[in-house]
């Protein structure tokens, strides 16, 4: 039964984060070496081109983990622990970049305080950090409303609809919204679904039967197809910066469950080799 439990996501959460970090690393650093336009080249190119989906996996498991944290600690402790976990490394990176990018003191503080993230471009300095810190800051308020909802799935769906309406309104009615900013706001849906899954993990057990696994595999396959459609073909799907939204949403949720199952199989059936692989991903997950 354990090998088909949704709680596998929680058990292998660190390893899933390690895989996400590895995929992001491929996106930034991997050089495609196969013969151009061969089948292997196309596979390599796709894996590299879609590597930013690892970010969505991070948003998903972050939302999931925050539910446990907010229930375990006071609000003050919650904020302090989140800040200590992520900000010091971000600040030190900013110091290092002062010397490589010739920042003055004002530019440095505008970057490490996240001001430029909101006023100029999200890609000024490790955009994920000010993005996730923003969500950490707002999470307790959101979770307060979430906890009071009688039907949390319906509540999450309503927030989804509100997000979609605001996204389309910003693009089509307000206009002049920085395109790069959608790279952040399009990750909000996966974060709030992570919160929903975290709540489910805390309260009840869900066992995946064959139909649920088939549905999960189908959802992952659909995400891969949409990633090809948006990231490789460059087509739009519903919202601006589509490749950072619906494709990665499906990949992050379904892929996380499939990864958890794979890690469980490695842990169960390939004791020696499996432990080595799991240790590598665990180290990457902790480091990330």
Report each predicted region and the residues it spans:
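Membrane-cytosol interface segments of multi-pass membrane proteins
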Residues: 1-169, 207-213, 257, 268-284
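Interfacial loop-to-helix transition and helix-capping segments at the boundaries
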Residues: 43-55, 117-131, 170-193, 225-258
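Alpha-helical transmembrane segments and terminal signal-anchor/GPI-anchor hydrophobic tails
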Residues: 184-188, 202-287
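Transmembrane alpha-helical segments that form core, pore/gating elements
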Residues: 192-198, 203
